[in-house]
């Protein structure tokens, strides 16, 4: 297993100690702290786990797949060995898998099919501040299972921005907080035009960013439809050295993987 240092690393002994004593934990950690990938791996050899699986809940398919791939690389393995993932229409787990990264719908179905959650020792709810009905339902069902059937089941709720103190009181759980990584950020406001479509405004903003800043450009858009419209417009306006790539959960795995690979020398990227 490769040794990587993240801001969360210093807190991992306390995470393990807390779960040795309590069945629930609220963990606050800002983006970049490493909580998504380091907490499940740190718990793999906990005595209370007893060889059972850890379920890591992610709200998006792209995040689920990426988290599993990162943890597998850290272990020097392929996805589907110690760490795997299950998302809609895609299953990368095996009999060896100890950490399963799943999306919210998968967890709900698991709870419905097997209320005892046999063979599962912990459920980690990641990015819980991204409140979804499926995530809230999953936590409610897991709490019910823990209270009625499985008092040995561990539940970890992790968030970057949620009110951790209030959530800890609700769950009757200890609360731990981690530091994050800070990066210098400059905020510029691009003037909007009410008489211009969103796609045209985004195109102008991207062109300005490419002209005035080095490096790649990451554009957040409301959904797949907007991504496709901006993609079509930018293909006709950026130069040949700039690659424009979409990124959303409906893309095939190979296309999503392209975004996560380094760009060729001398080329820039716009990721939508």
Language model features: what each stretch is:
Residues 1-272:
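P-loop NTPase motor module signature
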